[in-house]
């Protein structure tokens, strides 16, 4: 965190719109402050595009007057139901609201709102680091108002609430998710009383819509080190309420002196590994869900010990229900996550044995355009503390990647389509839709995958005719 003098703050607010806002506020005889995350991010040297202004008076009136003064190119949107307005000008967006005092009923996070002072408005902020305000009026331009020692908390890298955290979280339980999200994004510690209040109020999350919860959860998944957030969600008791499938991965069971690894912490390690490689949100979700089927597939076998057979397939089948319940997209993004969860054991199985062309070709056929992401996930999944074992897998993965590149250079297997279509089979043998069509297509597909025949239509058709004859099928024109 950097130190900012008032003169330096004036320089940081050099965009002409800030001075213009101050002049309009002076003309209208009201105080106006830029507040919240924008001010916080100035101190933390983080990019911030959200500019929020609080007016001790009518935020809508100031926004409308500002729009008139800015003239052509300025666009003002008014949201009277919320008492807010937005001004867009030269690529900059500023939100205006009047200073407010809020109170809540226990069964709702919708506040009862009254006009208030700047102090009232800062009192209702979620965290001290977001309760900062900088005056834009001409005589006090650049002056910081830090009512709750937010700067000190930033220096100490602490998330704390301005008022009693139990009231803060009970009034608006979404703030619990925001608390964990900020701690994750900023890598701050949650202050002790605030952390205890999270645990006491966790059940209150039930009144929050799933859409609001998943918005915060996605921000945790997208953070530089997402595991921070999931460890905290587990600690405070929110995780089993919002993501029970992930919570069930926690813990280690021992039998006859043999234990399995804690699949929750393994999953978080895989997620962090993926996060170091990519910002792809849905690849991160695939990492988060890659072992989600393990609790349902867990078995004890006297010789083998703990097993999780077919956990990848079981997990891929769980993805749809998880996405539907959590209000995640039920489109190609979900199918992408399903595919990676289902296939994530394939490269590991190949790397644990001899890396053959046919095995790599089959993998490439199944993964298609997502093969690189699948390999990234699988490499992240190697979290063994046995460095020799880990290095052996990584060396074999490198060989798999080399063979993938070689196969791709020879033939575009990523977008592979079976040279033999069902329509061609029906026309050749005069068939109506039947199971024999699928059998022949699969036989041709397997033959190409196993390098029995070349990946050409001519070879595939000849092979199809041969197999059809063995099945007792004859061409229609014979």
Model-derived features with residue positions:
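Catalytic cores of the polymerase beta-like nucleotidyltransferase superfamily
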Residues: 1-478
């Amino acid at each position: 965190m950097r130190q900012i003098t008032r003169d330096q703050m004036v320089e940081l607010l050099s965009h002409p719109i800030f001075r213009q806002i101050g002049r309009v506020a002076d003309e209208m005889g009201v105080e106006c402050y830029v507040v919240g995350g924008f001010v916080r991010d100035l101190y933390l040297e983080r990019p911030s595009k959200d500019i929020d202004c609080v007016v001790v008076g009518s935020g809508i009136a100031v926004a409308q007057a500002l729009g008139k003064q800015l003239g052509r190119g300025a666009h003002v949107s008014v949201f009277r139901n919320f008492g807010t307005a937005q001004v867009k000008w030269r690529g900059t967006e500023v939100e205006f609201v009047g200073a407010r005092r809020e109170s809540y009923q226990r069964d709702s996070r919708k506040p009862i709102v009254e006009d208030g002072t700047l102090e009232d408005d800062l009192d209702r902020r979620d965290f001290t680091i977001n309760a900062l305000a900088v005056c834009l009026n001409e005589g006090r331009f650049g002056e910081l108002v830090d009512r709750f020692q937010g700067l000190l908390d930033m220096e100490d890298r602490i998330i704390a609430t301005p008022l009693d955290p139990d009231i803060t979280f009970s009034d608006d339980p979404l703030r619990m998710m925001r608390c964990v999200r900020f701690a994750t994004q900023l890598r701050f510690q949650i202050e002790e009383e605030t952390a205890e209040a999270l645990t006491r109020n966790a059940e209150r999350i039930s009144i929050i819509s799933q859409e609001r919860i998943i918005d915060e959860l996605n921000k945790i998944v997208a953070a530089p080190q997402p595991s921070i957030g999931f460890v905290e969600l587990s600690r405070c008791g929110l995780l089993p309420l919002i993501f029970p499938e992930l919570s069930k991965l926690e813990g280690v069971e021992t039998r006859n002196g043999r234990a399995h690894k804690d699949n929750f912490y393994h999953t978080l390690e895989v997620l962090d590994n993926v996060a170091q490689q990519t910002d792809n949100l849905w690849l991160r979700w695939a990492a988060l869900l890659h072992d989600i089927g393990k609790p349902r597939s867990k078995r004890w076998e006297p010789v083998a010990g703990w097993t999780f057979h077919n956990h990848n397939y079981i997990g891929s089948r769980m993805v749809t229900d998880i996405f539907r319940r959590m209000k995640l997209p039920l489109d190609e993004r979900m199918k992408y996550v399903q595919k990676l969860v289902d296939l994530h054991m394939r490269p590991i199985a190949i790397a644990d044995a001899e890396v053959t062309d046919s095995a790599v070709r089959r993998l490439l056929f199944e993964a298609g355009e997502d093969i690189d992401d699948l390999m990234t996930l699988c490499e992240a999944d190697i979290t063994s503390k046995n460095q020799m074992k880990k290095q052996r897998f990584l060396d074999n993965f490198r060989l798999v990647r080399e063979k993938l590149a070689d196969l791709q250079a020879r033939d575009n297997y990523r977008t592979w389509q079976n040279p033999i279509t069902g329509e061609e089979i029906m026309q050749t043998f005069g068939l109506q839709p039947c199971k024999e069509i699928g059998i022949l297509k699969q036989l041709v597909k397997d033959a190409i995958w196993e390098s029995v025949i070349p990946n050409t239509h001519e070879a595939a058709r000849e092979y199809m005719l041969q197999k059809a004859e063995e099945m007792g099928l004859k061409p229609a024109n014979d």
